[in-house]
């Protein structure tokens, strides 16, 4: 019996890890990966950090170049797909080539959610999703330049830190009343706001751009009436899923390809993962998780489902952010207002804990990354704690 052919569409973390997971879990059939980028699949997190700060930055490949040949995975780089061929099971490229598939994994990622007012600036306006974006930004982030960043989410704050470290004068504009409002708890939001302000970043909350004039400098008029002048304008206000191919194939989409817990779409032969995917929960709600770890997890889940194997158990959600000399790691549930703090954030060393009826459900570490493994184990086991003991620095965490 002929073995099936699996095609992966995409060139990022989820795409590469799907290929790796399929081979690791025993798939020996024909395996192809199609990407519209010329590079090997590469890590995205460094784009807002080391790719802007290091003297001679290099892209970090998800898998080494030799892995693809050794594992007999056919890479098709720099190609554009015309149709997925859902009915015919034939992927068609814009160059006329067609490729048969039995199962499909879509990991086409996402683009920056557009902001037409700033997009009208053309090359004077920047977003950050790909290696080419980072290369362009690196050229313009020069000392003493005035940089305006719209959006105070994770990427916006990382860009503010990198721009400041490159000698720029950074201003961040945020519509909400706080920074990192979607994915950090209140005490961490307050810490980050103060950290950036101490570094010289001006952060304007509860504000937005109303008018833009492109001249020698870019003039931005805010809702507050203030006018800012910028040499460089960057924005990051969310994502727009690259789900056009899926929509044209009549898959279920909602600013992302809708998947179930097995990463399966409404077509049982088509799977999706990473930033392009959005999961329908048991209660019918749609949930998106934009992180490096989620891309890895969904790649592994999809590979298992495609091969008819048991699905792996998911660890608590985890992501990290490097800003200035700080490394922050977020694990578990970030919801809730009653967070406990161990240590002193003013010394750039602390852990915030989220207890619910004594059970640890989430945590954020500040330059304490070595504790994440233990905290992950606690969250997975549903361990309960005495709040006083948990926050007492004289008691080693591993003894609790």
Curated annotation (Swiss-Prot):
The UniProt entry's sequence similarity note says: Belongs to the bacterial ring-hydroxylating dioxygenase ferredoxin reductase family.
* BP-aspect Gene Ontology terms: 3-phenylpropionate catabolic process
A GO MF label: oxidoreductase activity, acting on NAD(P)H
Q: Which residues bind FAD?
A: 5-36
Names of the cofactor(s): FAD
Record flagged with keyword NADP: no
The family database entries (InterPro entries) matched by this protein are listed as: FAD-oxidoreductase/Apoptosis, FAD/NAD-bd_sf, FAD/NAD-binding_dom, FAD/NAD-linked_Rdtase_dimer_sf, HcaD, Reductase_C, Ring-hydroxylating_dioxygenase
The taxonomic lineage of its organism, from the top, reads:
Bacteria, Pseudomonadati, Pseudomonadota, Gammaproteobacteria, Enterobacterales
* Role noted for this protein: Part of the multicomponent 3-phenylpropionate dioxygenase, that converts 3-phenylpropionic acid (PP) and cinnamic acid (CI) into 3-phenylpropionate-dihydrodiol (PP-dihydrodiol) and cinnamic acid-dihydrodiol (CI-dihydrodiol), respectively.
Subunit text: This dioxygenase system consists of four proteins: the two subunits of the hydroxylase component (HcaE and HcaF), a ferredoxin (HcaC) and a ferredoxin reductase (HcaD).
**Which Gene3D superfamilies does the record associate with it?**
3.30.390.30, FAD/NAD(P)-binding domain
Q: What is its EC number?
A: 1.18.1.3
Which terms are listed as keywords in the entry? Aromatic hydrocarbons catabolism, FAD, Flavoprotein, NAD, Oxidoreductase
Pfam families noted in UniProt:
Pyr_redox_2 (PF07992), Reductase_C (PF14759)
Flavoprotein found in the keyword field: yes
Q: Which GO terms describe its cellular component?
A: cytoplasm
Query: In its UniProt entry, what is this protein called?
Result: 3-phenylpropionate/cinnamic acid dioxygenase ferredoxin--NAD(+) reductase component
Q: What are the binding positions for NAD(+) in this chain?
A: 146-174
Q: Which reaction does it catalyse?
A: 2 reduced [2Fe-2S]-[ferredoxin] + NAD(+) + H(+) = 2 oxidized [2Fe-2S]-[ferredoxin] + NADH
Question: Which NCBIfam families does the protein's record reference?
Answer: 3PPDioc_HcaD, PRK09754.1
Q: Which organism is it from?
A: Escherichia coli O7:K1 (strain IAI39 / ExPEC)
Domain of life, source organism: Bacteria
Q: In which pathway does it act?
A: Aromatic compound metabolism; 3-phenylpropanoate degradation
């Amino acid at each position: 019996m002929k073995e099936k052919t699996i095609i992966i569409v995409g060139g990022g973390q989820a795409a590469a890890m799907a290929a790796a997971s399929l081979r690791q879990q025993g798939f020996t059939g024909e395996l192809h990966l199609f990407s519209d980028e010329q590079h090997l699949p590469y890590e995205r997190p460094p784009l807002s950090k080391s790719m802007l700060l290091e003297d001679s930055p290099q892209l970090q490949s998800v898998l080494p170049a030799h892995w693809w040949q050794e594992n007999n995975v056919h890479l098709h780089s720099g190609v554009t797909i015309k149709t997925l061929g859902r009915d015919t099971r034939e992927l068609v490229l814009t160059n006329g080539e067609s490729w048969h598939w039995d199962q499909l994994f879509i990991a086409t990622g996402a683009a920056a959610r557009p902001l037409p007012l700033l997009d009208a600036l053309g090359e004077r306006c920047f977003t950050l999703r790909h290696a080419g974006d980072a290369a362009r930004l690196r050229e313009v982030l020069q000392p003493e330049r005035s940089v305006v960043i719209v959006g105070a989410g994770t990427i916006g704050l990382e860009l503010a830190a990198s721009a400041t470290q490159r000698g720029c004068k950074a201003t961040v504009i945020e519509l909400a009343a706080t920074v990192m409002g979607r994915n950090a708890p209140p005490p961490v939001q307050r810490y980050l706001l103060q950290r950036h302000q101490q570094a010289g970043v001006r952060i304007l909350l509860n504000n937005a751009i109303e008018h833009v004039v492109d001249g020698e400098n870019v003039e931005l008029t805010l809702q507050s009436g203030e006018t800012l002048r910028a040499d460089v304008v960057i924005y990051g206000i969310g994502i727009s899923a690259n789900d056009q191919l899926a929509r044209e194939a009549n898959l279920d989409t909602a600013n992302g390809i809708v998947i179930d817990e097995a990463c399966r779409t409404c077509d049982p032969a088509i799977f999706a993962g990473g930033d392009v995917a959005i999961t329908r929960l048991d209660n019918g709600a749609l949930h998106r998780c934009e992180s490096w770890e989620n891309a890895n997890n969904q790649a592994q889940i999809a590979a298992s489902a495609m091969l008819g194997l048991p699905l792996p158990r998911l660890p608590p959600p985890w992501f990290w952010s490097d800003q200035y000399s700080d490394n922050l790691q977020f694990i578990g549930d970030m919801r809730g207002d009653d967070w406990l703090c161990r240590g002193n954030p003013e010394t750039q060393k602390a852990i915030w804990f989220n207890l619910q009826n004594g059970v640890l459900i989430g945590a954020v570490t500040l330059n304490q990354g070595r504790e994440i493994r233990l905290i992950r184990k606690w969250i997975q086991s549903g361990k309960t704690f005495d709040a006083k003991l948990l926050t007492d620095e004289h008691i080693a965490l591993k003894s609790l």
